[in-house]
UniProtKB/Swiss-Prot annotation:
Functional description taken from the UniProt entry: Methyltransferase required for the conversion of demethylmenaquinol (DMKH2) to menaquinol (MKH2) and the conversion of 2-polyprenyl-6-methoxy-1,4-benzoquinol (DDMQH2) to 2-polyprenyl-3-methyl-6-methoxy-1,4-benzoquinol (DMQH2).
Pathways per UniProt: Quinol/quinone metabolism; menaquinone biosynthesis; menaquinol from 1,4-dihydroxy-2-naphthoate: step 2/2; Cofactor biosynthesis; ubiquinone biosynthesis
Protein family per UniProt: Belongs to the class I-like SAM-binding methyltransferase superfamily. MenG/UbiE family.
GO molecular function list: 2-methoxy-6-polyprenyl-1,4-benzoquinol methyltransferase activity; demethylmenaquinone methyltransferase activity
Record's keyword terms, sorted: Menaquinone biosynthesis, Methyltransferase, S-adenosyl-L-methionine, Transferase, Ubiquinone biosynthesis
Record NCBIfam families: MenG_MenH_UbiE, PRK00216.1-1, PRK00216.1-3, PRK00216.1-5
Protein name as catalogued: Ubiquinone/menaquinone biosynthesis C-methyltransferase UbiE
Lineage of the species this protein comes from: Bacteria, Pseudomonadati, Pseudomonadota, Gammaproteobacteria, Enterobacterales
Domain of life, per lineage: Bacteria
Binding residues annotated for S-adenosyl-L-methionine, in chain numbering: T74, D95, N123, A124, S140
GO biological process: aerobic respiration; menaquinone biosynthetic process; methylation
Keyword Methyltransferase set for record: yes
Pfam families recorded: Ubie_methyltran
């Protein structure tokens, strides 16, 4: 009997076995974790802070609520949510990568944020939380690294409370051709050089550029969220569509 063909997925522009991608992505983030915040500021000229602020403003989070910051990395969103939910609320900073989770924990504790934030190493495709548990879920620059995005979106839908909302902040497709060309030149020629200088790892930032190009565009991701069960899915193009914030509700 012939062997079954192996399922594949993308890792940047490469095609790899589905069961290998998770480990390959993990290697990338183990490599860059220590300089992740510095690189974010350098790569985006600090604009990532504005994108994240807009995400916070669209969250509708209130005191006493429960928030999941998925692929939360070094905790930029979790820190702000911690103040918003107050002592009676809860923020769960979850990341599949233990190096990133460690950096987030250390960063928030150094800032005195300790009372209402929990840290969980979790795979977005199989979230270890009860049904209807969170009032709000955010995933910031993480969905494109997930192997099975549809499965992850369904998992997020399951753990979100009725009336809750999901916010997906992610790189997307620039709206104008000249901007797209300039962005490509920057991504494929400048980013790897910055990665080499700061992290000594140009390949991880070459993967970053490639993973952005392979990520679903605005309308495709909107359709995926709808297929996962989310209602009233909309998106906001930021910085000319270089980044988009998708928002969907569970009713």
């Amino acid at each position: 009997m012939a062997d079954q063909p192996q399922e594949t997925t993308d890792f940047g522009f490469r095609t790899v076995a589905r069961d290998e991608k998770q480990a390959m992505v993990a290697d990338v983030f183990h490599s860059v974790a220590a300089k992740y915040d510095v690189m974010n500021d350098l790569m985006s000229f600090g604009i990532h802070r504005i994108w994240k602020r807009f995400t916070i403003d669209c969250s509708g989070v209130r005191r006493g609520q429960r928030v999941l910051d998925l692929a939360g990395g070094t905790g930029d969103l979790a820190a702000k949510f911690s103040r918003m939910v107050g002592e009676q609320g809860q923020v769960v900073l979850a990341d599949i990568n233990d190096s990133m989770l460690k950096m987030g924990r250390e960063k928030l504790r150094d800032r005195g944020i300790i009372g209402n934030v929990n840290y969980v190493q979790a795979n977005a495709e199989a979230l270890p939380f009860p049904d209807n548990y969170f009032d709000c879920i955010t995933i910031s620059f993480g969905l494109r690294n997930v192997t099975d995005k549809d499965k992850a979106l369904r998992s997020m839908f399951r753990v979100l409370k009725p009336g809750g909302r999901l916010l997906v902040l992610e790189f997307s497709k620039p709206l104008l051709a000249p901007l797209s060309k300039a962005y490509d030149a920057y991504s494929f020629h400048v980013l790897p050089k910055i990665g080499e200088l700061v992290v000594k790892d140009p390949e991880s930032y070459r993967y970053l550029a490639e993973s952005i190009r392979m990520h679903p565009d605005q309308e495709t991701l909107k359709g995926m969220m709808g297929a996962a069960g989310f209602d009233n899915v909309t998106y906001f193009n930021l910085t000319g569509g270089i980044v988009a914030l998708h928002r969907g509700f569970k009713f």
